Amino acid sequence: MVYDVRRSSAAASPAGHVRSREIMTIAVESPSQRARLRFREHPVEFLLGAFADVRPGEAPTVLLLTLNVFLLLTAYYLLKVAREPLILLGAGAEVKSYASVGQSLLLVFVASFYGWLSARVGRMALIASVTLFFAMNLAVFWALGIRGVSLGVPFFLWVGVFNTVTVAQFWSFAAETYTEEQGKRLFPIVGIGSSIGAVGGATIAEPLVRLGSPFLLMLVAAAILVSTVGLTYLVHRRNATLAATDSTKPQDAPLGRDNAFALIVRDRYLLIFAILIFVLNMVTKTGDYVLDRMLVSHARASAEALGIAPASYIGEFKARYFEWINTLGVILQLFVVSRVIKYAGLRVALILVPLASLAGYTTALAMPLIGVLFVGRVAESTLDYSLSNTTRQALWLVTSRDAKYKAKQVIDTFVMRAGDSVSAALVWFGTRAALGARAFLAVNVALSVAWAAMALLLGREHARRSEGSERFGAGRRFETAGRGAALRP
């Protein structure tokens, strides 16, 4: 589409006649033409645009990060499958239910050691050493397992530490890789790798178990972990030039010597963040317990009427439950998360999950039916694994390097497991006090209100922290829009 704009020259002849006339031709492309041009120039970014706002030159890094977290979650779900028969047959379901307390205690020392190490080595050395250490651990577990050594409890504790430490470390690295503006746009795509990795790991675990034993999964997971170190290095090298020319970004320098717990206590933003994660995990674990309790009771009654074993009934119910969560989670991550963050903002995205949780448990309290709780838990878990997870990772973009690595490790490991432990204690005391399912649902209604309050406070603190960068970004967008407006018809 071409427009001719004619204007008279300001200069005139002595007789007063117009001496010349300028003709300016402006080419204005239609939306379809612009789309075709962008596809020809940046095909990968154009295709990724269906899921988020990816700009020229950003595709390689975001795809490497997406593949990295995909592999991490694939490895975790392989190990999760390997863990179950070892703990259930070796120690029993009761030991498993209380093992989160042991994980919490263990993570105090792990988080402290991680903070100590991060202050003495560079970023790449930190990530590589931690990841390869876990990979070597798997080789040791495999060697012990094939010799008949009982691994149930040790391996269960180890998997809990491995998952929280490596995933938190990955998101710390991703948060340091991007600016706040980039992270808000691109983290939804990285989150796709997390969602699909969870599904992929669970899918390939079954045929691998048939090929050998749970110990084979350990070797496969170890190989996957080694490959993630290479992917991390590629992203690190892609950003090395920028880091070398920008003295404000000492990306591979060791961190400061501040204690991680002290960082959280001194910083209002981090303290609210920690409380939110603690309450969130209490709600989640207590909700899991109530659903399982109602399921067992329902299975015993329904299975007898249907003529099937209670174990089969529970297995089919759980398969359906996780299928709904995984499927809806991937759909939300692909098509909804980026748009909610872009158009509604992080504050709205942060509050949606506790509101869904509050609605679900309030409805279940009024109508304590397993079908009602099923729908509520699916909605809560789906939003938590997609929208809430991506939003929480984006909230770290405004923090310091020390906070991204040290404080995040404490919050995503120790604080998270502490919430699990307090929930386990609540269940222990509640069952011995003969509390019914409705009593636990009432507790979760109250906890959901506290969760929503923490989300509001955290959203407000985040808005204050990002205000300066948002003003700068708005000014840049205004200048760009102003230059572009001169060329529009």
Which residues does each predicted region cover?
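Intracellular loop-helix junctions on the cytosolic face of multi-pass helical membrane proteins
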Residues: 1, 5, 19-63, 93, ...
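Substrate-agnostic recognition of the 12-TM MFS/MFS-like secondary transporter fold
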Residues: 61-114, 151-209, 250-263, 268, ...
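Hydrophobic/aromatic positions within or immediately flanking transmembrane alpha-helices
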Residues: 97-100, 127-128, 187, 218-219, ...
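Small-residue-rich packing faces within the transmembrane alpha-helices of Major Facilitator Superfamily
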Residues: 108, 135-136, 226-229, 358-359, ...
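Membrane-embedded alpha-helical segments of multi-pass transporters/permeases
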Residues: 112, 139-143, 199, 229-234, ...
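A membrane-interface helix-boundary motif in multi-pass transporters
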Residues: 124-125, 207-223, 345-348, 429-449
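Structural signature of the two symmetry-related core transmembrane helices
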Residues: 126-140, 348-362
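Helix-loop junctions at membrane interfaces in 12-TM secondary transporters
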Residues: 143-156, 363-376
